[in-house]
């Protein structure tokens, strides 16, 4: 009988502890129009970007230390990349060997065909430079 009481007490304490836990974030973590999000971690900082229906400037860029509190720090591109004309969407960030890469989709100025472009930066905050476009 005493074992039953101990098990009941342990169960109650476990349930009370589980109920006391609080969420550390509340959705949305980044408010506003930002579909197709991508998040990377560089050292102890997180960076996020995504598609924005507000088309320009292109791709809002956010920073956070804890994945809860985000602050917009700029855009991947302040000016439209020279080879593009419209339909900027679905950027992806990658960080490798001290460089940050942003792959993104846009329509080519000459014929309106969608392509994937790539830009690089020495740090996640930018500035980002599009790699040279060639017709090859």
Where are the regions that the model predicts?
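Short, solvent-exposed loop/turn segments at conserved positions within beta-propeller repeat blades
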Residues: 54-57, 109-114
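Beta-strand-rich domains and repeat architectures in extracellular enzymes and scaffolds
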Residues: 29-56
């Amino acid at each position: 009988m005493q074992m039953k009481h101990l098990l009941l007490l342990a169960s109650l304490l476990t349930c009370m502890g589980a109920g006391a836990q609080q969420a550390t974030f509340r959705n949305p973590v980044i408010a506003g129009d930002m579909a197709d999000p991508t998040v990377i971690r560089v050292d102890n900082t997180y960076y996020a970007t995504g598609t924005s229906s507000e088309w320009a400037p292109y791709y809002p860029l956010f920073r956070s230390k804890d994945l809860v509190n985000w602050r917009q720090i700029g855009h991947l591109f302040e000016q439209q990349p020279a080879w593009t004309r419209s339909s900027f969407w679905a950027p992806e960030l990658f960080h490798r060997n001290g460089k940050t890469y942003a792959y993104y989709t846009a329509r080519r100025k000459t014929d309106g065909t969608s392509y994937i472009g790539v830009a690089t930066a020495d740090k996640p905050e930018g500035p980002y430079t599009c790699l040279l476009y060639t017709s090859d």
